[in-house]
Swiss-Prot record:
This is Large ribosomal subunit protein bL20. Binds directly to 23S ribosomal RNA and is necessary for the in vitro assembly process of the 50S ribosomal subunit. It is not involved in the protein synthesizing functions of that subunit. Pfam families: Ribosomal_L20. GO terms for molecular function: rRNA binding; structural constituent of ribosome. SUPFAM superfamilies: Ribosomal protein L20. One of its GO terms (cellular component) is ribonucleoprotein complex. The gene is rplT. The keyword Ribonucleoprotein applies. Keywords: Ribonucleoprotein, Ribosomal protein, RNA-binding, rRNA-binding. It comes from Rhodopseudomonas palustris (strain HaA2). It comes from the Bacteria. InterPro entries: Ribosomal_bL20, RIBOSOMAL_L20_CS, Ribosomal_protein_bL20_C. GO terms for biological process: ribosomal large subunit assembly; translation. The keyword Transmembrane does not apply. Belongs to the bacterial ribosomal protein bL20 family.
Length: 119
């Protein structure tokens, strides 16, 4: 059986790691051992933060809604309760966007929620 030299394969593997490590600082971009570790860790952070991003954005939407309903004399939790009682089904992302881009539409929703609480 013929001897197989691994130079081409190893070079291709290293090239792949270096490409992924592009933009890293110091030895992490140009020594294979450090670059591999850095790329692996970057992948772990990316995986974790894709999950975390969903939580972060939901928290942001809730903060925006809370700030937008305060002028109407309500807190976020009271507003959400009013929405469910009035039968309005709008998610937090849309509510947050409405509060920023279309204050008049958001005000109408807030008033309906407040009316549902009073009834």
């Amino acid at each position: 059986m013929a001897r197989v030299k691994r130079g081409v394969t190893a070079h291709a593997k290293h090239k792949k790691v270096y490409k992924a490590a592009k933009g890293f600082r110091g030895r992490r971009k140009n020594t294979i051992r450090a670059a591999k570790a850095a790329v692996d860790k970057a992948g772990q952070y990316a995986f974790r933060d894709r999950k975390r991003k969903k939580r972060t954005f939901r928290a942001l939407w809730i903060q925006r809604i809370n700030a937008a309903v305060r002028p109407f004399g309500m807190t976020y939790s009271v507003f959400i309760n009013g929405l469910s009682k009035s039968g309005i089904v709008v998610d937090r992302k849309v509510l947050s966007d409405l509060a920023i881009t279309e204050p008049a539409a958001f005000q109408a929703i807030a008033e309906k929620a407040k009316a549902a609480l009073a009834a």
